[in-house]
From Swiss-Prot:
The keyword tRNA processing does not apply. It is found in: Secreted. The record marks 105, 108 as: Important residue of the cationic membrane-docking site (MDoS). This is Basic phospholipase A2 homolog CTs-K49b. Belongs to the phospholipase A2 family. Group II subfamily. K49 sub-subfamily. Residues 105-117 are annotated as: Important for membrane-damaging activities in eukaryotes and bacteria. PROSITE patterns: PA2_ASP, PA2_HIS. GO terms for molecular function: calcium ion binding; calcium-dependent phospholipase A2 activity; phospholipid binding; toxin activity. It comes from Trimeresurus stejnegeri. InterPro entries: PLipase_A2, PLipase_A2_Asp_AS, PLipase_A2_dom, PLipase_A2_dom_sf, PLipase_A2_His_AS. Transmembrane segments: none annotated. The record marks 111 as: Hydrophobic membrane-disruption site (MDiS). GO terms for cellular component: extracellular region.
Amino acid sequence: SVIELGKMIFQETGKNPATSYGLYGCNCGPGGRRKPKDATDRCCFLHKCCYKKLTDCDPIRDSYSYSWVNKAIVCGGDDPHLKEMCECDKAMAICFRENLDTYDKKKKITLKLSCKKTSEQC
C-alpha cells in the first residue's frame, strides 16, 4: 500500500515521500506515463510499468509485509501477488536512493501539462 511504499522511500532516502516525490517530475504521483525529466522521474516511470504487470492486487489499498534488515528491504509474506507489489516498491525506493545526487528540488512540483508524451514502452 501507499503506507509501506512511503516507509521504504523514507528508509532508503531520508526524505519525506509525500513532499519530496509526490508530484516530482512527470511520472511521480497520479497520472499516466510521460517522458521522464531526469533519473528520479525515470524511477517513477519504471514503477508505473512494474505496477502495470501486477495482477490480483490493488497497489493503493492492499498491504504487504516487509522488513528492514541491515539497512536492506526484505519483502516477506506468502502471497506471491503482494510480494511482487513489494518488489516494485522496493525497486523504486532503491532507485530514488541511487539517484539522490541528481534530485532536483525545482522538479518537486511539476505541472503535468508541461510533460511530453513518450513513445517509450515499459
